[in-house]
Amino acid sequence: MDQRTLLAATLALVAAGQAGAQTPDAPTPAATPLDAVTTTATRTRAVAGDLATPTTVVAREEIERRDARSVLDLVRDIPGVESSGVPRTTAMQPVIRGLGDERIVLRLDGSRNNFNAGHRGRTFVDPELLRQVEVLRGPASTLYGSGALGGAISLRTINAEDILQPGASFGGVASMGWQSQGSGPRGSLALGARAGDFSVLGAMAGFSNNNFTDGRGTTIPYSEDEATSLLGKLGWNPGHHRFELSAMRFRDNNTLPIAASTATTTSITDRETVQETLSLRWSYDDPSMPLLAPQIVVYRNHVDIQERRLTGTRAVDGTTLTTTGIDAQNTSRFGLGAFGRHALTYGFEYYRDEQEGTSNNLSRSQFPTAQQSVLGLFAQDEITLGAFTLTPGLRLDRFEQESPNGLNDRSVDRVSPRVSLGWQVLPWMQPYVSYAEGFRAPSLTELYVGGQHFPGNFFVPNPNLRPEVSRNKEAGVNLRFADVLRDGDRLRVRLSAFRNDIDDFIEQTVLATTTVSRNIGQARITGVEAEAQYDAGTWWAGLGASALKGDNLETDQPLASIPAHRVTLNAGYRFLDQGVTVGGRLTATAEQDRAPRTPGVAQQTSGYGVLDLFASWTPTAAPNVRLAVAVDNVFDHAYRRSTWNSDPVPAFYETGRNIRGSLRIAF
């Protein structure tokens, strides 16, 4: 869909909504992110701040306030979470506790997003269509299988119920915005309706921008972008059942280097990225039947990237991955007297990946045509024994990988255990300890890749790669207080320390004439994290801090993906009578002087501080309208994120000052 068409449609609906809007409830103080409910950490509903698994929830209110252009803009303030890659929006990727790419499981409405193909990104969804983002930090293979060494990110899209006013049968939300960086407009429109047990949702969102500039006033080449997302849902709620059919399509067009996530300006291509996700979900929840709470999702996720090279061979390269799968679980709740209360969650997951790489419609060995089938069986029991909560879990995965070019097929089996123990010492204090193992089977590309990497250098397949296995030890404490400074206020604090030992770490080694992936032996990542949120209704404050260290124990060199020590402070004030909110965020990042000693790439990164300011107004005479302004990087500081330290010299700097404004109307 053309960007001008999207914005025109948004403006038209904004005008209509202003004329016929219904008045929502008056603003109320928000719960802190640690009070939010998550279903990712344990596959059951739980309060994020009460868990022995560090989990942070970004809810719809925060998503709307940020007016973010990417999922990474929503999560980069979470302790231990960073983004890798230069500031080209769709090419950037998340990093959790120093691990990124296929070492993080990414799920969209319960369907796996397994796509990861060298420098091409993987978070293909507009934040305007999201109702919640959940980030689980630390190994999660017991529940989510291969890839969850660093953690898991769960994205949940909006439903009709999220945009309809109480008692309304039809309604919607329209928004439009603009930012100075890249002179970029954006817009979104969501319409919902319900009749009896049925509901329907249709939504679209998109943005476009020219090239960004960094804090020095220098253009960031090939950072222009244009993307559109479409979402449709049908819901049916007969009795205690919930059926939901969902379809999403993301399309992105830009001109950029093949290695778009690095600071390169060569090998330019016209790239079109399309992701289509179709899912059918069923769940049943009857409080009178505690042994039965099943959830099943069947899905198909297809990613297709077409690249027309503008230099060199001028070939047309195709990169596709189709994941088809089913995820089924049930939770049984029961008591066993002196043996405590139990919430036993068990189920299975099956999915099949089929990938294909082409160049001018011929096979392209840099992204080899190959398939894999995965079956996982899992069980986890949350056992409450007085003040103690013991949660053991276990998962068995079997991989069957089918190779091209006559290479041997493979099968891999892996058992992933996890156990945690929490102790409610006092009503406001819960220390915990946990042990979790994660694993990542080698990707099809790592196993079977071939062809030219760059002129004079060629990929060498390695079908003998072993799975990566991580063993994470963690200790922490959850604190929660009420009525601290005034009646009704809330304070949540989480402190944690961990050590993650990774065996058979897979690293891509670039030699004089060849590039090969190999198991390097051992890596170790240690860290401490702190997260705190306070909310008093009229004002709030928050803190997020992390300090990580990562080493390749075989070479005694630092890992390149470890972010620098960082502290983020945010605070704001709500003038509830006037509907005005003002606030700011300060990010202070230390120097990163621990980087691999690799000639020809950026090494250390300097420390920096970045201040962002924001304000919004919901007029008392028009409570369905929200106007917002923000200034990112107020002092136009020039800086580089520490996870870019493997980029070629000279490396790019982050975007400079950015002034944003938006208008949102509910009707």
Region roles according to the model:
Residues 251-264, 400-402, 423, 427-474, ...:
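Surface-exposed extracellular loop regions of Gram-negative outer-membrane beta-barrel proteins
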Residues 212-217, 221-227, 240-291, 301-323, ...:
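Flexible loop and strand-edge segments within Gram-negative outer membrane beta-barrel domains
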Residues 160-162, 169-172, 179-182, 189-273, ...:
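Periplasmic-side early beta-strands and strand-to-turn transitions of outer-membrane beta-barrels
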Residues 487-502, 518-597, 635-638:
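Gram-negative outer-membrane beta-barrel transporters
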Residues 431, 439, 537, 576, ...:
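C-terminal beta-signal and adjacent terminal beta-strands/loops
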Residues 176, 202, 293-309, 432-434, ...:
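Membrane-embedded beta-barrel scaffold of Gram-negative outer-membrane proteins
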Residues 30-165, 475:
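Acidic, small-polar-rich N-terminal luminal/periplasmic segments of exported/outer-membrane proteins
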Residues 1-78, 163-164, 192-193, 228, ...:
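N-terminal Sec signal peptide and the immediately downstream disordered periplasmic leader
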